[in-house]
Amino acid sequence: MVYKTKLGEIEISDESIFTFEKGIPGFEHLRKFALVFPQETFPIGWLLSLEDSEVGLPVVDPKLVRADYDPAVPSEDLEEIEAENQEALLFFCVLTIPPGKPEKTTINLRAPIILNQKKKKGIQTILENEDYQLRHLLSEEIERSKTVV
């Protein structure tokens, strides 16, 4: 189906659509989002609202940025998205890209977006691990990962 989104009108398959029962912090009134990976921005993807064409969050697989990223998801969050365990879940972290200053891009490792592909449900959780902050400079995390791997 074709949807009007922050990235323009795009074809979105049902497999890419997820329901966030409680919305996403800051967008609690929005429930339906699609995860898309345009060729122009890959490996950065977009979590696009299907209810408000102005809302779209740039996201990336945190393992591409921090090789040792190992979130411990609270059990109540796993229950909310009907996940039996973490193994079958997809994790994405939101990027903040300042206009005109892409070198200042930060990644939010503290509050990942978690998607249950099987149930098509998602949640943004807040992790207890204090090593993960709301704003990590993306370039520093990529450099750090080179020494970890």
UniProtKB/Swiss-Prot annotation:
The keyword Cell membrane does not apply. The keyword Chaperone applies. It is found in: Cytoplasm. Its main location: cytoplasm. Keywords: Bacterial flagellum biogenesis, Chaperone, Cytoplasm, Translation regulation. One of its GO terms (cellular component) is cytoplasm. Acts as an anti-CsrA protein, binds CsrA and prevents it from repressing translation of its target genes, one of which is flagellin. Binds to flagellin and participates in the assembly of the flagellum. Interacts with translational regulator CsrA and flagellin(s). Belongs to the FliW family. This is Flagellar assembly factor FliW. It comes from Thermotoga maritima (strain ATCC 43589 / DSM 3109 / JCM 10099 / NBRC 100826 / MSB8). The gene is fliW.
